[in-house]
Amino acid sequence: MADQLIRATAAEGGIRAVGVITTRLTEEARQRHKLSYVATAALGRTMAAGLLMASSMKRSGSRVNVRVKGDGPLGGILVDAGLDGTVRGYVGNPSIELPPNAKGKLDVGGAVGGGYLYVVRDVGYGYPYSSTVELVSGEIGDDVAHYLVNSEQTPSALVLGVFVGAGGVTAAGGLLIQVLPKAARDEALVETLESRVAGLAGFTPLLQAGKNLTEIFSDLLGDMGLEIFSERQMLRFHCGCSFDRVLGALKILGEAELQDMIVKDNGAEATCDFCSNVYQASSDQLAQLIADLQAESTVSG
């Protein structure tokens, strides 16, 4: 099943629902970063959460940055997700592995530990909106739902899941269901919705049972006036790094530092944190950067 996002409403627009399947992009992240089982689950959940949050943004080019900063051995998570369906991310310690938790599942909460969730929404106007909440469990889903309730005053249910088998990621994605103000006053509706979401065994078991997003929404909201939008948005792991950007970053270091790299290392090597792409600049290319800096200095002088 292709990585995709679908949107739906229910209760005459009082309920907003978004679902994502992120199996392939999570597997790509696992391979790029050589992630352990628990690191794959942690990053995969956070990437799905980032895409779900970005889906509510309106302006083209809008992006959400999600940073999980905990005191656990994972060393933190950073995800960048866009309204355009692209996402990238990394963890501090990709090789960390822990025993299963008390429920026999991957111990994402133990890997993350206690700390804070930082969310930055950039709608492209140059004034990003940022908010911080304390982590509830470190399991990502609880933490992002806590953020949505406290920072955006929107009651939200978030179900995230990543299943990692011996051969890699076989199922990943999530659901975001939000009760908007026009429906929040209907206590019976809210209680029914909460009960159904709480009754889910998780997200990945639904995918493994062969259900698609449309069927999952129908099971949860089918008797609440469900309307599923026909458009399916494709999702993918994508990083905007490039060799030109690396050269630009190296140039900022200045002549002395560049000359030192030429003498000591015969060039420079840089690895992108987000995608693990490795870029190598030769001594000749560094020398050209120095020449460019000298030319610019002459012109400005």
UniProtKB/Swiss-Prot annotation:
> What is the role of the protein in this entry?
Redox regulated molecular chaperone. Protects both thermally unfolding and oxidatively damaged proteins from irreversible aggregation. Plays an important role in the bacterial defense system toward oxidative stress.
Q: Which gene encodes it?
A: hslO
Concerning Pfam families, the annotation shows: HSP33 (PF01430)
Cross-referenced SUPFAM superfamilies, in alphabetical order? Hsp33 domain (SSF64397), HSP33 redox switch-like (SSF118352)
Does the entry annotate any disulfide bonds, and if so which pairs? Answer: C239-C241, C272-C275
InterPro entries, per this entry? Heat_shock_Hsp33, Heat_shock_Hsp33_C, Heat_shock_Hsp33_N
Q: Report the CDD domains cross-referenced here.
A: Hsp33
Q: Which UniProt keywords apply?
A: Chaperone, Cytoplasm, Disulfide bond, Redox-active center, Zinc
Concerning PTM, the database record says: Under oxidizing conditions two disulfide bonds are formed involving the reactive cysteines. Under reducing conditions zinc is bound to the reactive cysteines and the protein is inactive.
Q: What is this protein called?
A: 33 kDa chaperonin
What the record says about family reads: Belongs to the HSP33 family.
- Its primary localisation, in coarse terms, equals cytoplasm
The GO annotation for biological process reads: protein refolding
Which terms in the GO cellular component ontology are assigned?
Answer: cytoplasm
Cell compartments where the protein resides? Cytoplasm
Q: Which domain of life is it from?
A: Bacteria
Give the signal peptide as a residue range, or say none if absent. none
